[in-house]
Swiss-Prot record:
The lineage of its organism: Archaea, Methanobacteriati, Methanobacteriota, Stenosarchaea group, Halobacteria. Pfam families: AAA_16 (PF13191), Cdc6_C (PF09079), Cdc6_lid (PF22703). HAMAP family: ORC1_type_DNA_replic_protein (MF_01407). Keywords: ATP-binding, DNA replication, Nucleotide-binding, Plasmid. Belongs to the CDC6/cdc18 family. The keyword GTP-binding does not apply. ATP binds at residues 73-77, 220, 232. GO terms for biological process: DNA replication. SUPFAM superfamilies: P-loop containing nucleoside triphosphate hydrolases, Winged helix' DNA-binding domain. Gene3D superfamilies: 1.10.8.60, P-loop containing nucleotide triphosphate hydrolases, Winged helix-like DNA-binding domain superfamily/Winged helix DNA-binding domain. It comes from Halobacterium salinarum (strain ATCC 700922 / JCM 11081 / NRC-1). This is ORC1-type DNA replication protein 4. Signal peptide: none annotated. The keyword Transcription regulation does not apply. GO terms for molecular function: ATP binding; ATP hydrolysis activity.
């Protein structure tokens, strides 16, 4: 029985004996992996990924897979779901290990490998102890290899938000471990990124070693978003959701790019807003308040997780927006401001081409909007860039980075 659904009373009057809004709030957690019948609109992606991992079920090598798609399109959920099913489907005598690494948290090679070793190790079975800190990267790799060979025939490793990893050689070392004679166990890597150009920017040796298939996850449409949320309706007590709550939450998420994570986040926040207000029902107004809150959270997460160069590019566009009556600026003008910022912060200045790529990545993430404008036969075609979020909010968020704060001391 979950804590939210428990009907038993508590002795302290400070705390409620149940929850008048939520019945099972865990269904609304971002990392929650639902049962197969609750996963919406991803049958084709599940089937394709399963084919790539099929070798592991029979004791052979799974393939490496690179998954692209915007935030909230089910990339992590489907990866975890298929890995769970592969473990359950393994032939008799075949042991499959799976591990999930969030590269936003474990963003160095040492952190990622030590986390993998700790998550995959069953000390009672292997007799191997994996300390959280204190060892060199090479020693953590050796512990990982020993752990894998002691327990598994195949291992599938999910590296989520791989673009935030500061050393892409981890892809090469994991995918080549068996070939290099480090282990007898087969290793397959599922690398997940919001950035469609990620592989184009990795080291050539890594690119050559990480032989992979690609999957692209399209955004959910409004109908799919509604179905996803109706499948989580039992997270709430019976009768507390007004009939317009789920359609409105889905509509807000569909306006962006079909972000299921955002839709679920809005629904959860709406319940929390209603609870804090002492309401008996979750209403449309609670959803609207939750949407504003979720949008700020989403934006801060995107900007705070961006590399330093991306923050400098966004700061350049932000400064132009704050100090001008215009809201859209040619790439050349934004680049001039970017150069000024980099010089002031003593940062390396990227080429114009790489700078354009960064702006495109931010447009892909929904932070920047890019529009082509035609200045005629003499002027040619140019790109204009504008911030989607309020410029003051963007500026405040970027300046939370200590490296960027020096800009305010100009």
């Amino acid at each position: 029985m979950t804590p939210d659904s428990s009907p038993s009373s508590v002795d302290d009057p400070l705390f409620e004996s149940g929850h008048r809004i939520f019945a099972n709030k865990d269904l609304l957690k971002i990392g929650h992996v639902p049962e197969a019948d609750r996963i919406v609109g991803r049958d084709e992606e599940i089937s394709k990924l399963a084919k790539r991992l099929n070798g592991a079920v029979h004791g052979y090598s799974p393939e490496n897979v690179m998954i692209y798609g915007k935030t909230g399109t089910g990339k992590s959920l489907v990866s975890k779901h298929v890995c769970q099913r592969a473990q359950n489907a393994a032939q008799d005598g075949v042991e499959i290990g799976t591990a999930y690494i969030d590269c936003a948290e474990d963003n160095t090679e040492t952190q990622a490998i030590s986390s993998l070793a700790a998550k995959l190790n069953d000390e009672s079975s292997t007799g191997i102890s994996v300390p959280h800190t204190g060892l060199s990267t090479s020693k953590y790799y050796k512990l990982l290899w020993k752990t894998l060979d002691a327990q598994f025939d195949s291992v599938i490793i999910i590296l989520d938000e791989i673009d935030l990893m500061n050393d892409d050689s981890v892809l090469m070392k994991l995918s080549r471990a068996e070939e290099a004679g480090k282990i007898d166990c087969s290793v397959g890597v599922i690398a997940i990124s919001n950035k469609i150009q990620y592989v184009d920017n990795v080291n050539e040796r890594v690119k050559s070693s990480f032989q992979h298939k690609e999957l692209f996850f399209k955004p959910y449409d409004a109908n799919q978003l509604r179905e996803i949320m109706f499948n989580r309706e039992d997270a709430f007590q019976d009768g507390v959701l007004s009939e317009d709550v789920i359609p409105l939450s889905a509509a807000f998420a569909a306006q962006e790019h079909g972000d299921a994570r955002k839709a679920i986040d809005i629904l959860r926040h709406a319940g929390e807003v209603a609870y804090e207000a002492g309401a008996e029902l979750v209403t449309e107004e609670h959803v609207r308040q939750a949407q504003q809150h979720a949008e700020k959270d989403r934006f801060r997460e995107l900007v705070n997780g961006a590399p330093t160069q991306a923050k400098a590019a966004l700061l350049a566009l932000t400064e132009l927006s704050v100090n001008s009556n215009d809201d859209a600026f040619l790439t050349s003008r934004v680049y001039d401001q970017y150069e000024h910022i980099c010089n002031h912060l003593d940062m390396d200045i990227l080429s114009v081409r790489r700078f354009r790529d960064i702006l495109k990545e931010q447009a892909f993430l929904g932070v920047v909007e890019i529009e082509k404008i035609n200045k005629g036969s003499a002027g040619g075609i140019h790109l204009q860039n504008r911030l989607i979020e309020d410029s003051q909010v963007v500026r405040e968020t970027i300046l939370e980075d200590s490296r960027m704060q020096d800009w305010t001391r100009e």
